Amino acid sequence: MGRKNRRNRQRRTEQRSPAEEERRKAREQAAWEGGYPEIIKENKLFEHYYQELKIVPDGEWDKFMDALREPLPATIRITGYKSHAKEILHCLKEKYFKELPDIEVDGQKIEAPQPLSWYPEELAWHTNLSRKIIRKSPELEKFHQFLVSETESGNISRQEAVSMIPPVLLNVQPHHKILDMCAAPGSKTAQIIEMLHADMNVPFPEGFVIANDVDNKRCYLLVHQAKRLNSPCIMVVNHDASSIPRLLIENNGSREVLYYDRILCDVPCSGDGTMRKNIDVWKKWTTLNSLQLHGLQIRIATRGVEQLAEGGRMVYSTCSLNPVEDEAVIVSLLDKSEGSLELADVASELPGLKWMPGITQWRVMTKEGQWFEKWEDVPTSRHTQIRPTMFPLKDEEKLKSMNLNRCMRILPHHQNTGGFFVAVLIKKAPMPWNKRQPKLQRRPPVSVCDASVAPEIVKAVADISAIADEPAVDAENGETKPCTNQSGSSKTDSVCCPPPSKKMKLFGFKEDPFVFLSEDDPIFEPIQKFYALDPSFPKKNLLTRTQEGKKRQLYMVSKELRNVLLHNSEKMKVINTGIKVLCRNNDGEQYGCAYRLAQEGIYSLYPFINARILTVSVEDIKVLLTQENPFLSKFSKETQKQANNLDMGSIVLKYEPDPQQPETLQCPIVLCGWRGKTSIRSFVFFLHRINLVQWIFI
């Protein structure tokens, strides 16, 4: 084997030209000397293309190019729905931002971080520091550690400024049903979840987010992002966005199609607006990327507006500056919608943001640099690469009525950001092709009680019915017909398994099932008694990921997501949903209850708990966070008194702020803990402990 590899290596060396051999040696030498040469930030075709399109105002081209060659500044966003967001902001301002202007890195004086003028409540900040400098500089190590720990705990998100724009324009309310079509890696999804939980006093908002991505591996990155926020209102699914299935929900005894109030359509794009952070784009950029993605972008956006509710809002966005991926897609949607869609004027919703209006005239260029003014000029040989929808409409009056000036193009040099495009669409009526959709014709069902029918046939018919069971849609008003089974009782199957093995090929890897607890499940009564759960506690929203054996962990979803899960198990590939609220003790029921509380779900569960609660002071919180298993004597007398009245087992540790003492911590804190024989300990992740200590006590 070794001799064969040597022969192959020699053969490859002999086949190289002298110039190739010289380049290879140069690369190896550069690697030995400490790294490869930097990518030259220059692309003549890119400059020629955008200068011809005139998307940059006259006299600003040099500033535009200079900005693209500079590294992207670091931007952070403070999680808005957390009750201690104001405390985090105060900590950043007083303990970190004030020190930064006194620090120099590589001879460069650091500017004081500034809030993004257009983001609400000063919850987003940017600095002239790049992420690389923050990571590598010893002078900024303390600041970097704070950012890392706060990011892991979900209190801060490090997110590019322009990527914060689409969720803001969605104008999310807590009751909205939301679809994020291309969600990974999940920073925008996290922002949407925050908006759903704007009122922390409501543990289960009526709305929810279904976050989808076509890449199975990136779905797990999405799960990691969402888990930081500990929401019971998020579901991660794995589908091709251009054919994401239409889901069903039960409403007043009938099954109807789920239409979303808000849809985020952040489509795959060529990414030439990200040159400041993805420097590979400089050498790889051609117009071919945009031409190849245009069709997919239209299909995804079309599927989005089909599933949008009337009066709903869809935000279409790309990190590309190319009109083939931007205005051309919007024009195609508006044209075939026949008045069902309109562009919304959202300029007033982002005061302080600088942006350029959408353009109405552009040309299409091939990767070789050949220009085409209109579709009729394109030779037949190019028809597979260039499509009619890539060009502006010939009807100028119709084009003008589309109000493309309401589209927003963000240029990097205007506010030191990346490049971005965003448009907001409002659905006024059903799409034309949905209006023409005929009613579904149903064949009389085969009764499973009919002894004359072979059991195998009955089973096959039942399987087919389960897969194809969609409600009949009224072609005139989009309403659905009531759906009942033959016995007159509603379907209450509590097991949401993945699709059958034959269908599983469509969806990729098999996931564990989602099994909801039944109303009379014996494991719930001891839990309810031990923690004195309120009768209003929605126990039917508890689920586990196993059908057999002991239930080690219990998760919780909102009522609305339970509805979605129960009626669509055959249609969708669910990667993750719900938050962990209870974990099984290693010692079983030795301490009064077989399940202890989980920190991830405590903010959702706490409003229903009426027992096992210790009210603690700030000093007690410090003891809990800095000591692993402190004795009772370490706590205040009041805490010791409360603890003496509790048996061993899982407990809630609650800190309530005192408005009469404004100099003390002014946000509530809820921690999970364990009352031992002579001690109390907190069940809080190590990183979460660190960040709590940092912003409360340091």
Swiss-Prot record:
Q: Where is the composition biased (Basic residues)?
A: 1-10
**An annotated GO BP:** tRNA stabilization
- Describe the reaction catalysed, as an equation: cytidine(48) in tRNA + S-adenosyl-L-methionine = 5-methylcytidine(48) in tRNA + S-adenosyl-L-homocysteine + H(+); cytidine(49) in tRNA + S-adenosyl-L-methionine = 5-methylcytidine(49) in tRNA + S-adenosyl-L-homocysteine + H(+); cytidine(50) in tRNA + S-adenosyl-L-methionine = 5-methylcytidine(50) in tRNA + S-adenosyl-L-homocysteine + H(+); cytidine(34) in tRNA precursor + S-adenosyl-L-methionine = 5-methylcytidine(34) in tRNA precursor + S-adenosyl-L-homocysteine + H(+)
- Name the Enzyme Commission number(s) assigned to this protein: 2.1.1.-, 2.1.1.203
> Localized where?
Nucleus, Nucleolus; Cytoplasm; Mitochondrion; Cytoplasm, Cytoskeleton, Spindle
Q: Which UniProt key words apply to this protein? A: Cytoplasm, Cytoskeleton, Methyltransferase, Mitochondrion, Nucleus, Phosphoprotein, RNA-binding, S-adenosyl-L-methionine, Secreted, Transferase, tRNA processing, tRNA-binding
* Residue ranges with Basic and acidic residues bias: 11-28
User: Mind listing the GO molecular function terms for this protein?
Assistant: mRNA (cytidine-5-)-methyltransferase activity; tRNA (cytidine-5-)-methyltransferase activity; tRNA binding
Query: Quick one: which residues bind S-adenosyl-L-methionine?
Result: C182, A183, A184, P185, G186, S187, K188, D213, D240, D266
Q: Per UniProt, what is one Pfam family of this protein?
A: Pre-PUA_NSUN2
Which ranges are annotated Polar residues under compositional bias? Answer: 482-493
The record's listing under SUPFAM superfamilies reads: S-adenosyl-L-methionine-dependent methyltransferases
Top enzyme class, one word, equals: transferase
Where is the region Disordered? 1-28, 472-496
Q: Which GO terms describe its cellular component?
A: cytoplasm; extracellular exosome; mitochondrion; nucleolus; nucleus; spindle
**Which residues are responsible for catalysis?**
C319 (nucleophile)
Q: Which PANTHER family match?
A: NCL1 YEAST -RELATED NOL1/NOP2/FMU SUN DOMAIN-CONTAINING (PTHR22808), RNA CYTOSINE-C(5)-METHYLTRANSFERASE NSUN2-RELATED (PTHR22808:SF1)
Q: What does this protein do?
A: RNA cytosine C(5)-methyltransferase that methylates cytosine to 5-methylcytosine (m5C) in various RNAs, such as tRNAs, mRNAs and some long non-coding RNAs (lncRNAs). Involved in various processes, such as epidermal stem cell differentiation, testis differentiation and maternal to zygotic transition during early development: acts by increasing protein synthesis; cytosine C(5)-methylation promoting tRNA stability and preventing mRNA decay.
The UniProt similarity line reads: Belongs to the class I-like SAM-binding methyltransferase superfamily. RsmB/NOP family. TRM4 subfamily.
Q: What is this protein called?
A: RNA cytosine-C(5)-methyltransferase NSUN2
The record lists the organism as Xenopus laevis
Question: Top-down, what is the taxonomic lineage of the species of origin?
Answer: Eukaryota, Metazoa, Chordata, Craniata, Vertebrata
Q: Please name the gene that encodes this protein.
A: nsun2
